């Protein structure tokens, strides 16, 4: 059996009650309780679906990445897709303290982020995509909360008009670089405080050398969702063509 990590997030925000629904709107769809979530999936023979984390440990997850210690860092896009509050997004650190395959400890690693969409663990810290910026957070005292924050790059999809079209999917490539999907918003990328020529990402994805922080453009772009197989082949997703290679 191949276990698949499952996260369950209720449709309401854990930070406060939803506004009263307009009676003229379509009726609300009831949420599915965490204990019943697996029943809603159809799983291919040979695979097994297991619940790894649910509210209140995690809410509204959109991206995740394991570090070298097996801790899971999860981007929570709180407040999507409304613009009532701009900086509700955050990153959670989940830990399985007893090794039973279920996360039982949750810490807010970073907060106050506007529409975070990507996360990648490297060099003892965490890269987080928060359009138009890519930040690097690090916990230096071991309390599970980031105490350093550095803006590594800026210029990604500055308009932020469409949350489905901003950069996402930070993945490790066989070339030992961190790859990312630029999406439809493109960008003109620079390191903050420098006068160098910006890297244009119009219609192109990107990759970063985590040691030197050199960024370069890469091929065509995905909309939201990108990964590699064991042979280095790149798979991308878009609304029109769900899976491309």
Regions found by a protein language model. Give the residues of each.
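Beta-propeller domains with acidic blade repeats across secreted/periplasmic ectodomains
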Residues: 16-245
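Bacterial N-terminal signal peptides
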Residues: 2-13
């Amino acid at each position: 059996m191949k276990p698949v990590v499952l996260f369950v997030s209720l449709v309401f925000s854990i930070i406060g009650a939803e506004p009263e629904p307009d009676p003229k709107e379509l009726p609300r769809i009831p949420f599915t309780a965490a204990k019943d979530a697996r029943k809603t999936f159809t799983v291919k023979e040979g695979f097994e679906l297991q619940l790894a984390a649910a509210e209140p440990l995690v809410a509204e997850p959109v991206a995740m990445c394991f570090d070298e210690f097996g801790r899971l860092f999860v981007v929570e896009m709180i407040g999507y897709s409304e613009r009532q509050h701009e900086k509700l997004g955050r990153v959670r650190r989940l830990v399985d303290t007893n090794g039973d395959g279920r996360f039982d400890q949750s810490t807010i690693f970073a907060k106050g982020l506007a529409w975070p969409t990507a996360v990648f663990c490297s060099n003892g810290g965490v890269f987080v995509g928060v359009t138009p910026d890519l930040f690097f957070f690090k916990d230096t005292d071991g309390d599970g909360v980031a105490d350093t924050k550095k803006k590594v790059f800026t210029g990604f999809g500055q308009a932020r008009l469409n949350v489905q079209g901003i950069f996402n999917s930070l993945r490790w490539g066989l070339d030992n670089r961190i790859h990312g999907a630029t999406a439809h918003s493109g960008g003109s990328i620079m390191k903050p405080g420098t006068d160098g020529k910006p890297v244009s990402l119009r219609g192109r994805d990107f990759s970063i050398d985590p040691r030197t922080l050199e960024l370069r453009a890469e091929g065509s772009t995905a909309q939201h969702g990108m990964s590699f197989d064991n042979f280095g082949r790149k798979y991308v997703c878009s609304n029109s063509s769900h899976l491309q290679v």
